[in-house]
Swiss-Prot record:
Binds NHERF1 and GPRASP1. Interacts with ARRB1 and ARRB2. Interacts with SRC. Interacts with USP20 and USP33. Interacts with VHL; the interaction, which is increased on hydroxylation of ADRB2, ubiquitinates ADRB2 leading to its degradation. Interacts with EGLN3; the interaction hydroxylates ADRB2 facilitating VHL-E3 ligase-mediated ubiquitination. Interacts (via PDZ-binding motif) with SNX27 (via PDZ domain); the interaction is required when endocytosed to prevent degradation in lysosomes and promote recycling to the plasma membrane. Interacts with CNIH4. Interacts with ARRDC3. This is Beta-2 adrenergic receptor. Belongs to the G-protein coupled receptor 1 family. Adrenergic receptor subfamily. ADRB2 sub-subfamily. Residues 1-34, 96-106, 175-196, 299-305 are extracellular. The modification Phosphoserine is found at S246, S261, S262, S345, S346, S355, S356. Residues 1-23 are annotated as: Disordered. The keyword Flavoprotein does not apply. The chain crosses the membrane at residues 35-58, 72-95, 107-129, 151-174, 197-220, 275-298, 306-329. It comes from Rattus norvegicus (Rat). Its main location: membrane. A lipid is attached at C265, C341 (S-palmitoyl cysteine).
Length: 418
């Protein structure tokens, strides 16, 4: 999304006149172009490389193929499209001082830009709802949101995003009627996004503000529930140690079950924090732009063009942040290391008790590797020996149903590898 009213001059250009034939100014301009080209190339490479890594990791390792990570894949796809089809052309528009790709691609490129932002925030909104269901209804979660249902939800997100982005632009509902805008629409070398006031406000509300409000509200509820659950765990542990101290001394299995449940809940809450960071980063990167986007159509000369384009690029840079945030997850870190050949590609035991073999599939192994022992505090087991029912509580402070695998181990199904 390029700034409204841009007259195809150097955006983000250094201060000072650009008088023709002035050697000093010309050298400054050339240095600025080279510097910006390098910076923008780094941004594009970071976006593409990071999100390809995320998509490949989830596709290759079955351990990462959870419902939540299906949504993470959708988010990574939106960021990848941004890095491949939006940011490079935006960089060219800035550096070349004109649009070199024709009117059709100008509108198509702008539509893709709006599509990626809309799909991203709607996916984040869905992730917030997913985590809310998972933490408030852990026993119903697997039936309420299966992987097939997740695929349908993702498809609906992209269909809705496509309609709200492509339809108004391709139908020219966005177009302004003043002379400068009409002249730009007619020129093959002008791709400035002149919009009417109604479109700017309506598109910002539908594509950003409404999903943002829903996301913030739902996630605030998630953290409230999570806080209450941690308090229940603390109380359950207190009652357990007070009433069953002698039994624990004789048989440590009950204590192990309670500790394992607490570990699982702490892992879930760490996953919530990671997702919260992702949502918070997205909001911080895009909210300033959408505020300016509305202000600009109300008071055209209030916001300098340089500020507008800087905030637009701050939103673009967000697409490179998410892969870095995913590194908070031990599962993602291990997957990234193996994909980058920083770990052996032979069978690897994950901290959750699963191993990755040479063909990329994951199998369960009961053995603990050296890595697993060293990371026990950080990467808690999700598949453990079945504890005694009398001492095993779930994240809500109640006794959960147990799923026993072929080796007699308890596999909690509500996992979140993030």
């Amino acid at each position: 999304m390029e700034p409204h009213g841009n007259d195809s001059d150097f955006l983000l250009a250094p201060n000072g006149s650009r008088a023709p034939g002035h050697d000093i100014t010309q050298e400054r301009d050339e240095a600025w172009v080279v510097g910006m080209a390098i910076l923008m190339s780094v941004i594009v490479l970071a976006i593409v490389f990071g999100n390809v890594l995320v998509i490949t990791a989830i596709a290759k390792f079955e351990r990462l193929q959870t419902v939540t990570n299906y949504f993470i894949t959708s988010l990574a796809c939106a960021d990848l499209v941004m890095g491949l089809a939006v940011v490079p052309f935006g960089a060219s528009h800035i550096l070349m001082k004109m649009w070199n790709f024709g009117n059709f691609w100008c509108e198509f490129w702008t539509s893709i830009d709006v599509l990626c932002v809309t799909a991203s925030i709607e996916t984040l909104c869905v992730i917030a709802v997913d985590r809310y269901v998972a933490i408030t209804s852990p026993f119903k979660y697997q039936s309420l949101l299966t992987k097939n249902k997740a695929r349908v939800v993702i498809l609906m997100v992209w269909i809705v995003s496509g309609l709200t982005s492509f339809l108004p632009i391709q139908m020219h509902w966005y177009r302004a009627t003043h002379k400068q805008a009409i002249d730009c629409y007619a020129k093959e070398t002008c791709c400035d996004f002149f919009t009417n006031q109604a479109y700017a406000i309506a598109s910002s509300i539908v594509s950003f503000y409404v999903p943002l409000v829903v996301m913030v509200f739902v996630y605030s509820r998630v953290f409230q529930v999570a806080k209450r659950q941690l308090q229940k765990i603390d109380k359950s542990e207190g009652r357990f140690h007070a009433q069953n101290l002698s039994q624990v001394e004789q048989d440590g299995r009950s204590g192990h079950g309670l500790r394992s449940s607490s570990k699982f809940c702490l892992k879930e809450h760490k996953a919530l924090k990671t997702l919260g960071i992702i949502m918070g980063t997205f909001t911080l990167c895009w909210l300033p732009f959408f505020i300016v986007n509305i202000v600009h159509v109300i008071r055209a000369n209030l916001i300098p063009k340089e500020v507008y384009i800087l905030l637009n690029w701050l939103g673009y840079v967000n697409s490179a942040f998410n892969p870095l945030i995913y590194c908070r997850s031990p599962d993602f870190r291990i997957a990234f290391q193996e994909l980058l050949c920083l770990r052996r590609s032979s069978s690897k035991t994950y901290g959750n008790g699963y191993s990755s073999n040479s063909n990329g599939r994951t199998d369960y192994t009961g053995e603990q590797s050296a890595y697993q022992l060293g990371q026990e505090k950080e990467n808690e087991l999700l598949c453990e020996e079945a504890p005694g029912m009398e001492g095993f509580v779930n994240c809500q402070g109640t006794v959960p149903s147990l799923s026993i695998d072929s080796q007699g181990r308890n596999c909690n199904t509500n996992d979140s590898p993030l």
